[in-house]
Amino acid sequence: MALHFTQVTIVGVGLIGGSLGMILRRKGLATRVVGVGRRVENLKAAVELGAIDRYVVDPKEGVRDADLVVLATPVDTYDRHLTEWASCLKKGAIVTDVGSVKGLLVEQAERAMPAGVHFVGAHPIAGKEKTGVAAGSDQLFMGARCIITPTKTTDPQALEQVRTMWQETGSVVLTMDAHLHDKILGAVSHLPHVAAFALINALAEIRDQQIPSLDL
């Protein structure tokens, strides 16, 4: 499907959020990309690096006109963020995230959505030794796995838009139950990043082959 958003708002413009913004802008997938954060110097750097078009420090202002909101802050801040600005989202908006923990957080996020607003959980498995928007790259997600965690109530059109967005980043998109995601990621969390990523890729390939004995 052809993908284009009038406004994408990224809440938390660090390595992941900044890299996503760079891709959205380079590929023309959004008319404007707005960054939301608390540190103005970081947001100014994000503009200079091409990660966002403009920034605001008031999240309510930042999300009000957004077609898509990407929550790219630490997962332990999700509840605070959604409580603060979810009611400001326009009808038809989509909210997604990039967090490494799903499960209950996905359920909480869905409950926080106003009528007509849709949440789709996502976890791009990509990173670098360095963090922050200065380490961002429009190649960060190329060839990486991105796990999307829909539920029974996920809006199909919103799901497809989020899936397509991550495919546009060069990611290989995998769909998985949120709680199963947490079990698998928890099992590999003690491994070095390279080994963990390799194991996730192997599990994804097994799933893609649709082997009946493995419910992945």
Q: For each of these PLM feature ranges, what is it?
A:
Residues 38-39, 73, 98-100:
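Short beta->alpha hinge that forms the Motif I/post-I loop of the SAM-binding pocket
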Residues 140-216:
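Internal alpha-helical scaffold of NAD(P)-dependent oxidoreductase catalytic cores
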Residues 59-94:
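Rossmann-like NAD(P)-binding element
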Residues 84-134:
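Rossmann-like NAD(P)(H) cofactor-binding subdomain of soluble oxidoreductases
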Residues 7, 32, 118, 145, ...:
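Residues at the starts of beta-strands that form the adenosine-phosphate
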